[in-house]
Amino acid sequence: MGNDDFQGVIGRTTSESEPWWPDPVLPPESTPNLVVILLDDTGFGHLGCYGGLVDTPNFDRLAARGLRYNNFHTTALCSPTRACLLTGRNHHSVGMRALANFDTGYPNMRGRISHSAGTLAEILHGEGFATFAVGKWHLTPMREASAAGPFTDWPLQRGFDRFYGFMQGETDQFHPELSEDNRPTPVPRTPAEGYHVSEDLLDQAIGMVRTQESLVPERPFFLYLAFGATHAPHQAPDDYLAKWRGRFDEGWDVCRQQVYERQLEMGVIPPGTELAPRNPGVRPWDDLSDDEQRVACRLQEAFAAMLDHTDAQVGRLLDALEDLGISEDTLVMALSDNGASREGFETGITDTFRFFNGIPQPLDEMVERIDDIGTWRSNTNYPRGWAQVGNSPGRWYKSHTHSGGVRDPLIVSWPSGIDSSVNGQVRSQFHHVIDLAPTILEILGIDAPERVKGVEQQPVEGTSLAYTFGADAVDAAEVPTRKAAQYFEMQGNRAIWADGWKAVSMHEHDPLHAFEGGLNEDNWELFHLDSDFSECHDLAASEPERLGRMIDLFWSEAERYGVLPIMDRTGNLFAGHGTPGTPAHRDRFTYHPPVPRMPPEAAPPLGSRNWVMCFEVDRPRGDEAGVLLAFGTFNNGLVVYVDPEGHLVYDHNAFTTHTVLRSEDSVPTGRSILEVQQQRVRRGPGRAWLLVDGVPAAEADIPLIPTMISPVGMDLGRNPTGISTAYEAPFAFTGTLSLVTIRTTRSFHPDEEAAFEVEAAFLTD
């Protein structure tokens, strides 16, 4: 058994036999290492080498040793772009229409990459590469991202040897939900000890590369480094925040003009490009009040500090590659996943989950918290006016299929593979993120396999852009793009590009409040991108026949690549199905501590339902105290604990507005059953009760209960994120917490917004 592939000779003895050793799977010695650096929500005009006002010397360093692309496009959203990047196929084709968090019941949105679309990591691993994923993943259904899995779509099961990072679409930069390989792992330090997740990610990435080069340098590596930055929350170390104080006081109108002029001067936009008109909902800077300007500047400073800090981490990686003597033979691609985000409303927010709950923040509250902005005590996102600056010179934002959502920076650097004579040049051929995987495969001389892990593969749909590395490609008219067409679709927003023309239709202005009319009622615009880079001149009226052909082409491509059905109703961003075996399908939860932290989608939906929590505790001395359950962070969450005086406490923290219930008497010594109950009106206020051994102990009204609580999930027996200032985190429970049970009212209805369906009945059984 097991000898079918043996090519030696087996006799009765070794003297009569001939040994044989299979050749190891190793690429040729000239094979480059691969590094893909992925930024999050970073617009076309944010990086310094693209005209941005933030110092990014290390991205600039890459650009100076390589090429910048100014006609490169993504899907307008994070999970879909990642799916395209890693597979070379369109996001609908592989089951990732939108966010990985949900399965809508259609093939184009399963919340995971189809296994018929093998990832770059799976292909390269089979060719002998070491493969590392560090940072944001967001390609696994989040209900499967807990310590219990299943792990079918975790990084290690999709071709990576190692993983260190976070599974969710965003995370608190000071209190991330970390996983290592196939298991959750604690944050190694506290913010007070200098922790920031971007620095931690680079520690891990550099460590993986150094280990590989030290122990098995014969194997080239593929490092996929996906930062949480610059996705909100915009958080950075204090010294970076201080550096940017006062740097944006001129306001977003002046700054946008400055970016535009820098882009023209650098040549990253064509001569004659116009600066697109102000987006609706962005007021002229001079119309803002003094307080609105103060807050807006501070929020932009936090963003700048975060990007600056991220650039410094990229510098650490580049320095490490040089120290190891491998920088010349390493192909680096740096890009963003979509345009700058408008999720900070018109005036900004100090907690990003206000956006997902549809709750703007009062200005006076932001003024009061202005010194928290950018620190671990905030969860900020900037106003849309600053996002418009980041998307200069284009229109609209992340999730839109206009240029502000889908045109992104791409830098390619490969000193030993791209002639130094082209260093610093700009390439203008139209390309899309699905083209990067085919580019890498072409460079390596690898054909896309017909089967991966026994699964027959879909055709690769991208077009290699390796032809643009040549010196003659500086002239896109002389060396035109090899792409024929590219569709875009996100939340009903649609576009189609072909032969230098783009037709685009906006279906929604806000992802949580979509246009209620049908897709056929949407207006289509037509732009000639070859002469109108910033999509300023709508030619739909003067070119009706061309527009008609483009619309027909969109529907043809949509059918070809699995775009249909297009989700056209309000709230589809968070639509999903209560799959059996998941929290959305259950109303009773039983935990036997200790249990690792659960991500929000793998925990009970405490924001959207009415619930009862019961804790079986033992306090044999009577002085035991600590946290029983915590969900969220300092900025938004809820926590149940026994205080040092022995009182049962429930603290409901709605965007730092605390409602605190405290039992009048101490919890008895010995064994007790402690209970917290909460009911709510749909999207409204609620009421909570405390019970100790079945006896009512406290009750209070709760003025606001956010439906979506936090990107940070639920802990039992401790609270590392410090939801309350009444104790010092993690305030681990010093007694015995033997059992936690949670019962909820069923509120999920298939094909509707799972997160927003709530019954008002109070649980009594």
Region annotations inferred by a language model:
Residues 530-534, 694-697:
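Asp-box/BNR beta-propeller loop motif
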Residues 551-569:
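Charge-dense polyanion-binding interfaces
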Residues 413-415, 529, 741-747:
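Short beta-strand-to-coil "C-cap" segments at the C-terminal boundary of structured domains/repeats
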Residues 2, 13-15, 529, 756, ...:
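Exposed, low-complexity/repetitive linear segments and helix-based recognition motifs
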